[in-house]
């Protein structure tokens, strides 16, 4: 739900209508990432009349958050893969680059596969199983590689491109180190990432079903979230504290 902010997916709004028809049925809303503002939206739009919220800390003490500003992302990526052993996920923005980077890694002797929404389901399942089993070390993927991914020994997650918002970044980076052992979350940033994300926000197809006024509200919200994501790439403060503060958690 938090990925859609104020409007959510239109189908989610039907839940409130169903709740009116079935007032005695308990309802539990779950999300991995939600700012305090989005929590209030969920309560309001899904007709939770009593404030009854349980939150776990966003802090993952075993994760090291790193931002590298570079115009040589591929060189940096090869360096980190050769420096650190273990399973990895590399998130990239588009499907074409998943294949290109995979081929490059294979040429360097690093076992890798690519994954995106355009592949047949059977192919996606096979590649995920090969990666889960350790037969393949690195999965190069778009954000389609997300739901249900729970491999405990991922030693690092690399974002080859800056995501459009902190919610996406936190969820994807959080696939590292689920076994509690040290892991690294590395974001490679170049100024073109910000320009590309602005273009995607302004020309995105996911909001085409919305009316003009709502579409403008959603676009302005997405610009603000992109601004917060860009600040993360430039901040001099502790990145862990930045993440915790973004999600409304107090830090010392």
Task: Show the residue positions of the predicted features.
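Helicase motor core with emphasis on the C-terminal RecA-like subdomain
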Residues: 1-213, 224, 249-251
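C-terminal accessory/connector segments of nucleic-acid motor ATPases
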Residues: 206-252
């Amino acid at each position: 739900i938090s990925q859609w902010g104020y409007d959510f997916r239109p189908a989610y709004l039907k839940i409130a209508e169903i709740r009116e028809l079935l007032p005695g049925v308990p309802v539990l809303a779950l999300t991995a990432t939600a700012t305090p503002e989005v929590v209030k939206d969920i309560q309001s739009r899904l007709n939770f009349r009593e404030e009854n919220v349980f939150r776990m800390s966003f802090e993952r003490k075993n994760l090291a958050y790193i931002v590298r500003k570079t115009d040589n992302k591929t060189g940096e990526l090869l360096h980190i893969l050769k420096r650190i052993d273990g399973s990895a996920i590399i998130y990239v923005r588009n499907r074409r680059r998943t294949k290109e980077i995979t081929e490059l890694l294979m040429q360097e002797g690093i076992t890798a596969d690519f994954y995106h929404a355009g592949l047949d389901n059977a192919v996606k399942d096979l590649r995920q199983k090969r990666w889960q089993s350790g037969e393949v070390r690195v999965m190069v993927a778009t954000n389609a590689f997300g739901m249900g991914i729970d491999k405990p020994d991922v030693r690092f997650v690399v974002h080859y491109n800056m995501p459009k918002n902190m919610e996406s970044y936190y969820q994807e980076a959080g696939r590292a180190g689920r076994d509690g052992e040290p892991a690294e979350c590395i974001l490679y940033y170049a100024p073109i990432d910000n320009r590309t994300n602005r273009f995607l926000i302004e020309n995105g197809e996911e909001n085409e079903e919305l009316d003009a006024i709502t579409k403008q509200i959603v676009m302005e919200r997405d610009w603000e979230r992109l601004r917060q994501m860009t600040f993360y790439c430039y901040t001099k403060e502790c990145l862990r504290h930045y993440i915790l503060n973004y999600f409304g958690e107090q830090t010392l």
